[in-house]
A protein has these predicted regions:
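N-terminal helical cap/lid subdomain that shapes the substrate entry/recognition surface
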Residues: 1-80
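Hydrophobic alpha-helix position signal
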Residues: 24, 49-52, 89, 111, ...
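Short glycine/proline-centered loop/turn elements that form peptide/ligand docking sites
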Residues: 57-58, 83-88, 151-152
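Short, acidic loop-to-helix structural element flanking the phosphoryl-transfer center
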Residues: 70-98
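Conserved phosphate-coupling serine/threonine residues in phosphotransfer and NTP-handling enzymes
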Residues: 100-102
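Asp-based, Mg2+/Mn2+-dependent phosphohydrolase catalytic module
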Residues: 104, 108-156
């Protein structure tokens, strides 16, 4: 089963947007960054941020991970229903993978906060994440994009 992180487990986009604003402020003397000018797809935005970081900002992914670790409890809380569904699916020996367009450091911090990291077999992040996960798990893999569908799958 391929589970969309942001649609099912917890929406990381507000945390991402706040990090972009913080990074733009924090690094403005090194390299200007306009968060509103970045592509909506976070995988594509990561490529732009890689070029931005070459101007002397350094490892933006590590900065994102630190920011997320410090603030993730404010943005994401585990859902009892989703946790129960993941437990049921794991108990039924269902292979679970998570996909997101978010950068991997943000996705990993989110999964840990949500308690899902120990239940999943694979995480694919960035551009083409779903395609990579389906390639890994097989074309017959069920794709889940909302919590209600996850609950239904766990009862099957």
């Amino acid at each position: 089963m391929a589970i969309e992180l942001d649609g099912v487990l917890g929406d990381t986009r507000p945390l991402w947007r706040d990090w972009l604003e913080d990074a733009a402020r924090r690094f403005r003397s090194i390299a200007p960054l306009d968060p509103d000018a970045l592509p909506a797809d976070r995988g594509e935005a990561a490529a732009v941020l890689d070029r931005w970081a070459e101007a002397g900002v350094g490892d933006w992914r590590a900065a994102l991970a630190r920011f997320a670790e410090d603030r993730v409890p404010v943005y994401l809380r585990p859902s009892a229903e989703v946790s129960a569904a993941l437990r049921a699916l794991t108990a039924a020996d269902c292979r679970l993978g998570v996909f997101t367009d978010a950068p991997e450091p943000l996705a990993r911090v989110a999964l840990a906060q949500l308690g899902a990291d120990r239940r999943i077999e694979a995480l694919e992040a960035g551009t083409g994440a779903l395609d990579r996960l389906l390639e890994r798990f097989g074309p017959e893999t069920v794709v889940v994009r909302d919590p209600a569908a996850l609950d239904l799958q766990s009862r099957s």
